Amino acid sequence: MESHLNPDGVPRPSYVFSADPIARPLEINFDGVKLDLSHEFSLVASNPAANSLGSKNYLQVCLRIRPFTQSEKEHEAEGCVQVLDSQSVLLKDPQSILGHLSEKSSGQVAQKFSFSKVFGPETSQKEFFLGCIMQPVKDLLEGHSRLIFTYGLTNSGKTYTFQGTEENIGILPRTLNVLFDSLQERLYTKMSFKPHRCREYLKLSSDQEKEESANKNTLLRQIKEVTIHNDSYDVLCGHLTNSLTIPEFEESVNSCDQSSLNVDNIKYSVWVSFFEIYNESIYDLFVPVSSKFQKRKMLRLSQDIKGYSFIKDLQWVQVSDSKEAYRLLKLGVKHQSVAFTKLNNASSRSHSIFTIRILQIEDSEIPRVTRVSELSLCDLAGSERSMKTQNEGERLREAGNINTSLLTLGKCINVLKNSEKSKVQHVPFRESKLTHYFQSFFTGKGKICMIINISQSCSAYDETLNVLKFSTTAQRVYVPDTLSSSQEKSFASNKSLQDVSLDSNLDNKILNVKRKTVSWENSLEDVLENEDLVEDLEENEETQNMETELTDEDSDKSLEECRVSTCHKKNKELLDLIEKLNKRLINENKEKLTLELKIREEVTQEFTQYWSQREADFKETLLHEREILEENAERRLAIFKDLVGKCDSQDEPTNRICDIELETEEAHNYVGVEDIFHSLQDDVTDIKKQAELAHLYITSLVDPQEAIACLQLKFNQVKAELAETKEELIKAQEELKNRESNSLVQALKTSSKVDTSLTSNKSTCNETSEMPKNSRAQTHSERKRLNEDGLQLGEPPAKKGLILVSPPITEEQNKMGEMQQSVSEVVEGNRVLKEKNEELKRLLTIGENELRNEKEEKAELNKQVVSLQQQLRFFEEKNSSLRADVEQIQASYNSAVAELQTQKAVNQEQRDRILKLSQEMETAARSIESNVSQIKQMQTKIDELRSLDSPSHISKIDLLNLQDLSSGAKGDNCLNTSQQLPGGDFSSTWVKEYHTQEISRENSFHASIEAIWEECKEIVKASSKKSHQIQGLEEQIEKLQVEVKGYREENSDLRAQESQGKNRDHQLKEKESLIQQLREELQEKSVSLRVQVQLVAEREQALSELSQDVTCYKAKIKDLEVIVETQKDECKRLVELEQSILEKESAILKLEANLKECEAKHQDHIRTNDLSAKEVKFREEVTRLANNLHDTKQLLQSKEEENEISRQETEKLKEELAANSILTQNLKADLQKKEEDCAELKEKFIDAKKQIEQVQREVSVMRDEEKLLRIKINELEKKKNQYSQDLDMKQRTIQQLKEQLSNQKMEEAVQQYEKVCKDLSVKEKLVEDMRLTLVEQEQTQAEQDRVLEAKSEEADWLATELDKWKEKFKDLETRSNQRLNTGTMDDLDVLTRKFSKLQDELQESEEKYKADRKKWLEEKAVLTTQAKEAENVRNREMRKYADDRERCLKLQNEVETLTAQLAEKNSELQKWREERDQLVTAVETQMKALLSSCKHKDEEIQELRKAAAKSTGTENQTMNPKPEYNDSVDLGGVETEPQSTSLEISRNTAEDGSVVLDSCEVSTENVQSTRFPKPELEIQFTPLQPNKMAVKHPGCPTPVTIKIPKARKRKSGEVEEDLVKCENKKNSTPRSNVKFPVSEHRNSPVKKEQKVSVGPSSKKTYSLRSQASTVSANIASKKREGTLQKFGDFLQHSPTILQSKAKKIIETMSSPKLSTVEVSKENVSQPKKAKRKLYRNEISSPINISGQVILMEQKVKETDHQILKRRLRTRTAK
C-alpha cells in the first residue's frame, strides 16, 4: 500500500513524538489537488511509453546540404553554408557579386540555425536513410502513421533524395526494400482486404479480388522489368536488415498489439498509391493519359467524420515485393509532370505523394484487420523566382501555383506555432490542396518529419536564408499523435467480433453504449463512419428485392425453398447478432468498470497522500513550536538559576514547601488534559468495538444493498467522530500552550521580584556586618528561638545566615524565603511537567498507532465497500442489459407472434375465398351440367318431334340448331332467317292445297319452335358469358394461388417453429389438387364451349377482346381489392343467372307439353306425295355444295402454301439477322483491336517525339563541343574571316530551308493526325448508330415474328374449323341421303339461301385475310428496304474505316521514314565531324605555309618601303602586305564572336523545339550529299587582295569584281590620342554589354592590345603616308565608308534573317573588345610599349551603330554596290 501511495520513494513520516524530527520541506506543493483529472484519466489506457515520448511530438526537421556542381566550384565556391556540428549550421553573408543579385540584402554577417539533424554535402544516400528515415519505417511497422516531406528551392536535390538514381537509389526505394525484407514471410498475399478512406478498410469478394489482380497486372505490363542496383541490395543485406531483425520486429509487434492477439498469426498486407498535385488539381499517377482527349481524370479531396482528409477514387495497388513497388514507382514517375527550366533540366512541376499503407491482419479461420498504418512520402516542388528561372507561359503558371501552395504551408505552420502560446486561431488549411491533405497529420493522425534541402551556391543566398527561417518556425510546431491510441481503442473494441467488415462497423455505430458516469470517455473518436456502409447495405437490400421481384411462375417450389432457407438464415444471423451484442456489452461493461475502478483507486490514493502530507506538516509545525518554547524556557531557567545561586538567605524547608504548593497547583491545572486523553482512549476503544461490530454485521448481511447503506451510515458516523476527536485534540493542544505561556509569564514576574529583593538583601547585609560583636550572641539566641517557633509552627528549617532582630528585617527574610520557595516550586513543576509530557507523548504514540490501525481497518472497509458497490453496479448493469435483451427478445417474439397471427388471418381469409370460389365453381359447373343435360334432353325431344313430323321440318330444325350453335353472336340474323322460314314455307305452291286450319296450326307450331330456339340461344349466350366469367375467375384463381403460395412460403417458416402446421399444409395440398381438378374440368368445358361458339368471322372481335382483356387483367393485378368486389358482383350475377335458368327450364317444360300436342295434331300431315321432286332438287344443291367445298379446299391449300412461303422468308430474315449480329460482333472486335493499335501508334509517336527531343539535346551537347573546338580552331584561323562569313551566310539559308521543311512536315503530320482522330470519332458515332439501328431491326423482327405466329395460329384454328365444318357437312350429307324420300322443295330453297349466306361470309373472310396479307407484305417490304439501307450504310462505313486504317498505316510508315532520316542525319553528322577534323588539319598546314609566305612577304615589304621613298605618289596606291596581315589578325580576333553568336542562336532555336543546324552541317539537296547548300549569293575575297571582292549571282555565269578603297595610316601621335579616346569610350560603356566571361578571351593576347578607333579620328593619316600627295588624300576623303560599312549596307537590304544575324554579328564584334578592356584595366596604369600597329577603319574596327540604321553619304552616281542592293531587294521581296 505504501509503495503505491508514495511513488516518489519519499519515506512516510511517523506520528511518534519520540522519533527523530524530520527536516521540514521549504515549500508545500498543493498543485496536485488542482490537477485536471479528466485529462489524466483519459490517458490511463494509453501506453506509458507514449506519455514519456510526449515531449518528442514536435515537428522533426532534418537538413541536407547539396554538394557543389562543377560550374559552382569554379565560380561560386565561397562556402556560404558551414556545418558546425550534427545539429547546427552557420550561414555566412557572401562577399561576391553573385550573392547580391537579388534586391534584398541581409544585414547580418552570419546566422546560426539548429535542426534535429544536419547532413553535410559528403553524406551518402545510405547514411541519410539510416539517420533520418529509419525510425519512421520502424514506427510504420509498429502500427503508427508518419508523414515525410521535402522542402527547399528548385535544383536543391529534393527529387534526388526522394527517388535517387539507378546507381544510387533514394529514400523511397530504400524504405520499400527495408519494409519487405523485414516483413518477409509475414506478408498477406490475398486481396481480401483493401484500404478505404483514411483509416478504414473494405472486405472484397472473390470477383472484386479478381478485378484488383487484373488491374495490378495491367499496371505492371505498362512498364518493363526494373533492376535495382547492387547498392540497394547491399543496403538490404547490410546494416538496415540488422537494424530490424525478426525477434526485434516480433517484440515491436507484441508491444503494439493487444494482449489477445497471437503474434504468429499476424500478417501484413502492403498497399501503395501514387498521386500528384499539379496546378491545384489532383491526378493519379498510376492512371495513364487518356488517348481520346489527352487529359487525365481529376480526383477530389474529401474528409471523413473525424476530419481526416483522403482522396476519393484513388487507386490502391497491393504489392508483394520491393520489385513490384519499384516498378510502380517508375510508372508513376513516367506520368509525373516534369519540365525544363533555366536552373534545372528536369524540374518537377508538381507535388508528388507516394503512400504506403499497411493492414495488420490476424490470419485465423476468419481473418480480421487489427490495425491500419501508413507512411506518406511527399516530394514537394521547389520554390522559384521568375527573375532567375525566366519562365514564361505555362511554366510561369506552374511556378505561381507551386509558390502559392508553399506559401499557404508556411502560413499554416506559422499559425500552428503561434496558437500554442495564444488563443486557438484559424489555420488556413483549405487555401491549397497540399495543406488540406496535410491537415490530418497536423491534427493528430501521426508524426511529421520534414527534410530541408539547400544548396551552397552564393547566387541562392536569399532563398536559402528564407528556407532556413521557415525551418526554425516549423521546429516549434507541436504535432499530436492521437490517431494511434484512438485506433488501438477502436480496434480493441472490435476484438471479440469474428468478422471485421462493413457490417460490423455498422453494428459498432448502432450499438455503441456509453457510460454516463465517466463523461470524459465520450470523445469523437468512438463515432464510426457509416455513409458508405449504409449505401452498401441499401444496395444489397435493393439487389435482394430485385431478385425476389424477378422470380418466374414456373420456379414456385424453388422459390419456396429459397425463402425458407433465407428466413432460417436471417433468424440464425439475428440470433448470432444478439449473442455477439450480448458478449460485446459484457466486455464493454467489464472494461468500463475496470476503468472506473482504476480512476477511483487513483483518486483515493492521491487523496490519502494529500491527507498524510497535511498531517505530517501539521505535526512538524507543532514540534517546531514546542522546541522553540522549550528552548526559551530553558534559557530563562538558566538565568534564574544563576540569580538564585547568588542568594543564600533562604532555607531548604521553604523550598520544599514551595515545591509542594507548585505540585499541587500543577496537578490541579493538568487534571483536565489527562481526563481528555483518557476520554480519547475510551473513544478509540469504543470506535474499535463499533468497527468490529460493523464488520461482523457486514459479514452477516445477506442483502448487499442494505449492507452498503448501513456501512455508509456507520462510515459517516465514524468520520464525524474522528472529526470531533481531532477538534478536541486541537483544543487540548491550544489549552496546553496557553497554560504554559501563563506559567512562564508568572515565573518571569516572580524572578523579577526576586531580583529586587536580592538587591535589597545585599544592602541590608552590608549594614548589619558593621554592627558590634556583642550583639551577635543575642541575635543568635533570638534566631534560634525564631527557628524553634518556625519549627513549632511546621515551617521548614531556615538556612544559616544573619537575621536582624528588628521586625522589618524579619519581614524581608520572610519575603526572601517565599521567593526561594517559589523558585524551587517552579523548578520542581518544570521537572514534573517534563515527566508528564513524556507520559503524554507515550500515550499519544499509542493513540496514533491505534488511529493508524483504525485507519487501515477503515481503508479496508472502504475497499470492501467500494468492491461491493462495484459488484452491485456490475450486477445492476448486468440486470439492466439482460432486461434490455429480454425486452428486445420479447418484443421480437411479440412481433413474430403478431406476424403469425396476421398471416394466419390472411391465410384464413384466403382459405375462405378459395372455399367460396370452389363452391361457386361447383355451382357453376353444376348449372352448366344441368344446362347441358337440359339441352341434350331438348335435342332428344326435338329429334323425336322430327321423327314424328315431316322430314322437311326436321331438316329445318337441324339447320337452325347448327346455325345457332355456329353463330353465337349473330342472333338477330338467325332470328330473321327463322322468321323468314315460315313465310317461305307458306309462299310455296304446294302449301295452298291444304286447308286454312292446317296453315294456322303450322304457323302456331313454327312460332312455338322459334320461341324455343330463341330461348335456347339465350341459354347458349348465357353459357358463353359464364364461360368467359369462368375464364376470368380461373385467372384470378391462378393469381390468388400465386399469392397463396407466397403466403405459404412465409407460413412454412413459422410452421417450422410450430408443430401444428403440418395438418394445414396437407389440407392446402388437398385443396390445391381439388383446384387443379377443377381447373382441368373448367378447361375441358371451356374448350368444348369455345369450339362451339367461335367462328371464322369473329377473328377481329376476338383480337380486340383479347387486347381489352389484357388491359383489364393488368388493372386487376394492380388493384386486388377491386377484383374482390367484382368477384362478389359476379357471384350475385351467377345467382341471378341460375334463377333465370330455372325459369327458362320451366318454360321449356311448358313448351315440351305444347310440342307433344302439336305432334299429335300433325301426325296426319307427315306423309306427302311430292317427296321425289324435292329429293332431286336437294341432290342438285348437294352437288353444288360439294363443288363449293372443293373450291374452298383449293383456296385453303393456296393459303397454306403462302403461309409456308412467308415462314420460309421469316426464317431467312432470322438467319440474315444472326449473320448481321455476328458481323456486328466481329466489327466490334475489329474496332477494339484498331483502338488498341491506335493507342500503340500514339505511344510510339510519343516515344518518337521523345527520341527526337533526345537527339536535339544530343545535338545541343555536340554543339557545345563544337564551340570548344571552334575556339581552338579560331586561334589558328585568324586569317579565314571572310571564308567563315561565307559559311555563316550559307548556313543561314540552309537553316531557313530546313526549318521550313521541318515545319511543313510537322504541320502536315499534325493535320493528318487530327483528321484521323476526327474520322475515328465520326466512325465511332456511326458504329453506335448502326448498333441502334440493329437493335431496332431486331425489335421489329421480333414483333413480326410475333405477328406471324399469331397469324399462323389463326390459320391453324381456321383449318381445324374447316375440318369440323367438313365433318358437319358429311353428317348433313348422310342425313340428306337418309331423308331423300322425305325431303321437300321448300327445304332446298332454304338450303340455297343459307348456302349463299355462308358463301358471302366466306368471301368476306377471304377479303379480310387478303387485306391483312397485303398489309403484312407491305410492312415486310419496308423492313427489307430498311435492312438493305442499313447494310449499305454499314458497308460504306466499313470502307471508310478501311481507308482510315490505310491512312494510319501510311502515317506510321512516314514516322518510320522520319526516324530512318534521323538516323541517317546522325550518321551524316558523324561524317561531317570527321571531315571537320580533316579540315582542321588542312587549315593548320595552310597556316604554316601562310606564315612562311608572310615572312617572305615581310622581307619584300621592307624592300618596297625603301623603294617607296624614292617612288612617286602613284605608287602609294599599291598593296601593303604588312597592314593586311595585321588586319587579318584583327579579323581573326573578331571571328570568335560571330561564331559564338551563331551558337547562341542555334541554342535558342533548339529550346523553341525546332531543329537547328550548325554552320558546317551537311545539306542533302538534290539527293547528292554536298558539304554546303546552294548559296543565294557568292562573295569571294582573299587576304592577299583585300581591296577587291568578287560577287557572283546564281543566274550570272561570271563574277563581278568590286574594288574597295583603302584607308590611310596614322601617325604615332594620332595613334596615342586615339588610344586615349578609345579607353574613355570603353570606360563609359555600360557593364551590361558584357556577354561573355573572361575565360573565353584569356588565350588571345593580341586582343588586349587592340584599341577601337571610332569617329573622325579614324580618318587621320598615318605617319608612313605623310609623303603622299594631296590627290590621294582627297580620294581617301571621298571614299570615307569602309568595306565593313558597305557590307552593313549590303546586309541591310538583304533578307530579314540575314539582317537579324548581321545585327548580332556587329554587336558581338564590339562586345569582346570591351570585355578585354575590363580585364586589362588593372594593367592600364603600367602600359606596355605597344607595338606599332596599323589600324584600319573599314574591316578591323567594329562600328558602334545599330544593325538597322547604317549611315552613309549620299551619292548622285549609282555605284556597283547600289546595283547589287537593288537586285537583292527585288529578289528578297518574297
Curated annotation (Swiss-Prot):
Residues 1002-1059 are annotated as: Necessary and sufficient for interaction with SHTN1. The modification Phosphothreonine is found at T1598. Plus-end-directed motor enzyme that is required for completion of cytokinesis. Required for proper midbody organization and abscission in polarized cortical stem cells. Plays a role in the regulation of neuronal polarization by mediating the transport of specific cargos. Participates in the mobilization of SHTN1 and in the accumulation of PIP3 in the growth cone of primary hippocampal neurons in a tubulin and actin-dependent manner. Oligomerizes (via kinesin motor domain). Associates with microtubules. Interacts (via C-terminal globular tail region) with PIN1 (via WW domain). Interacts with PRC1. Interacts with SHTN1 (via N-terminus); the interaction is direct and promotes the association of SHTN1 to microtubules in primary neurons. Associates with microtubules. Phosphorylated during mitosis by CDK1. Residues 538-555 have a biased composition (Acidic residues). Pfam families: Kinesin. ATP binds at G152, L153, T154, N155, S156, G157, K158, T159. It is found in: Nucleus; Cytoplasm, Cytoskeleton; Cytoplasm, Cytoskeleton, Microtubule organizing center, Centrosome; Nucleus, Nucleolus. This is Kinesin-like protein KIF20B. GO terms for molecular function: ATP binding; ATP hydrolysis activity; microtubule binding; plus-end-directed microtubule motor activity; protein homodimerization activity; WW domain binding. GO terms for cellular component: centrosome; ciliary basal body; contractile ring; cytosol; growth cone; intercellular bridge; microtubule; microtubule cytoskeleton. Its main location: nucleus. Residues 538-557, 740-799, 1625-1663 are annotated as: Disordered. Expressed in the brain (at protein level).
